[in-house]
């Protein structure tokens, strides 16, 4: 003990005489007065001075916080570990954020959860590791009381938000895999952002109470880091500790286990049903064997997700609950510091499990950071395919997607047109079912489709068309030439019989015009992307609507209508069939000039 220059606050703790602030701080740290005194006596410390001690000491210096007399190598070891965790975590999460910001194919609503997880882990490493490392090198807390509170608040906020985000990811995958049809179009970008906002507010709600007297932010372990006070054996502190672990640790853990259990069971049940449908030939046996491999891989990844969550936060929970139960005398400074380091290390494996193992993230990182291609084991063949897919997303393509229902015009049996719109984004499956990494879907596009249908009950002379219906795709190439191709297998087109004396204007209204009964009208779906290419010529759409006569603009650049006029255009889009009664069917489609 120091005599003369310091006065005793409690047994074994001393403060400088000229620093009255130390007395107030040490007295406020009741968590470290009684319980830590007994805990430190359990540590077998080698003699470092002529007078050996194993209790907290404060040297005559400008630092008001007490220190723990432990070997220097203990501080340096923890400092080196936390520095490694911080650098690795910041690099890994930065790669995930960078790949998301550069790649258009990754900007899906479901991937917003992965990005939020990367942001919280990055901020956790950025705010905790440098300060923890600095104080470990000084072997004491050097940033004052306000610095301790701010440090502990950031650790609590980002740590809680990370755990809640893990739960949100598990719930999102649960609905997509177990209820695929019901989940189509449900998760939009706006809803995903709203969910993340709720997660941040929820985390903030559990991080602010120590500022208002419910528990407190105090130094912990080797007194080189800070956290909330879980050592004080008072009703207020114990209530906060118990509620915090129920609503922040135990409930998310139960939800994660529940979701991944039913995800595994759903995929296993589906594979068994498919196996019963198929025969017992050699090919089906190979497929069954491959499904079993995928199931086992999925089970291992789900197990890793749960185990890493438990390993990261269970030690911290165990220490806090031990103090909550009144057995804080058994806790040593090392037992308080090591769980904090393990919890912060979760920022390393989260981006690996949820993002970097995903094929599209690896390809995006390898594309934009070529020096990491060999480290990520990305072959050049896959990289070229990924580059081609990126180029294809920058073209205006007419397509029909089962998961995209936005902007669809549908005509009811009463003859009225109705606009039905769905979610403005897509929710898709992952590239590999067994990967269980983030959901990936193609970037959503603004799609407009017009379907002309006719209730067969109103038309007694209806005869189905023998030719297969199709849709036209309008593809813009780098040369600026538009070409028309047949639709994919997934395209769904509706061809109906147009009622006599009725046709559609470009506004969707029904107008009376003389049209032959047997005419079949088809209007293709047009996908309009917001991105333009510098190689494409400027396109100005014009519309030509005729209420009296109906004309068809074919694929020829110039064609005479019923009145002898000539319709010209650089490119014309039409699927209508000519009829012997009238000249041609009206072209209610844009002409690109």
Swiss-Prot record:
Keyword Disulfide bond: yes
First-listed, main subcellular location of the protein, grouped into a coarse class: membrane
Topological domains, Cytoplasmic: 99-112, 172-191, 265-300, 358-593
PTM annotation (N6-(retinylidene)lysine): residues: 344
Extracellular topological intervals: 1-77, 134-150, 213-243, 322-336
Region annotated Disordered, chain positions: 397-449, 547-593
Compositionally biased tracts (Basic and acidic residues): 581-593
Transmembrane segments: 78-98, 113-133, 151-171, 192-212, 244-264, 301-321, 337-357
Physiological role: Photoreceptor implicated in non-image-forming responses to light. May be able to isomerize covalently bound all-trans retinal back to 11-cis retinal.
Family per similarity comment: Belongs to the G-protein coupled receptor 1 family. Opsin subfamily.
Annotated protein name in UniProt: Melanopsin-A
Source organism of this protein record: Danio rerio (Zebrafish)
Upper lineage: Eukaryota, Metazoa, Chordata, Craniata, Vertebrata
